[in-house]
Amino acid sequence: MSSILSYGQTLKSPNSEHELNFKLNEVGTPFYSLHYKGKEVIKESQLGLELVDDETSLMNGFEVKEVSETSFNEVWEPVWGEQSEIINHYNEVAFTLEQPEMNRHIIIRFRLFDEGLGFRYEFPQQENLVYFVIKEEHTEFGMTGDHTAYWIPGDYDSQEYDYTT
């Protein structure tokens, strides 16, 4: 368990162009930021989930219990699609966070690819977090400018839709 007041760690993408910074502030709230080629593209942004009927929620009071880093690199051939090969190359860090007051754990897993960042919340099996309902997600994406975003429309049965900006 961490006994320091705050915690911070950095992870770089395989080509070192993206740099993720993760930290817990003085009250144990998780934050992240992202730099690309030394320029900040996602400013310090809060992570957390508010639970229904839970005064503490999964917002703060965390300590870093464990940090696990790994790298992965594979090329695979899809059965169908526009590309004949898919490169899956990333560096990963998983932070196991503990709320000592509630004896609960979550894992925040980040993957840094040469093309960008992905992350998710994981809920390991535990006695004090068996059944819960997320009331509100407080994950922030503090963009540093008026960036263009691309996405695929959801809830469609086909992969043949244009990207939207």
Residue positions per predicted region:
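Bacterial Sec-dependent N-terminal signal peptides
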Residues: M1-T10
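N-terminal accessory beta-strand-rich subdomains and adjacent acidic, glycine-rich linkers
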Residues: T10-T165
